[in-house]
Amino acid sequence: MTDNTLPSLSDPAATPERGSAAETVDPRLLEILVCPVTRDTLVYDAAAGELISRKAGLAYPIRDGIPIMLPEEARRLPE
């Protein structure tokens, strides 16, 4: 019999750290995602845990392995 309990969200060991292997994005998803502002391709910055749109100058965060593709959630890149 297996234990089907889920880890507690309050348990720090159960939450992946930013940029950790558990927060990587599926490469197939990266192939189809585009910047919602420019419709241009994105560059995956694994160290920062972000998808970069150079044309728009925006960095979209990745939270819990899910890209947040909302311009209002993106970080403006320095010029």
Swiss-Prot record:
Pfam families (alphabetical): Trm112p
Coiled coil: none
Renumbered residue ranges of the record's region Disordered: 1-22
InterPro entries per the UniProt record, alphabetical: Trm112-like
Cellular component aspect of the GO annotation: cytosol
Taxonomy, superkingdom: Bacteria
Family: Belongs to the UPF0434 family.
HAMAP family hit by this protein: UPF0434 (MF_01187)
Protein name per its UniProtKB record: UPF0434 protein GbCGDNIH1_0252
Originating organism: Granulibacter bethesdensis (strain ATCC BAA-1260 / CGDNIH1)
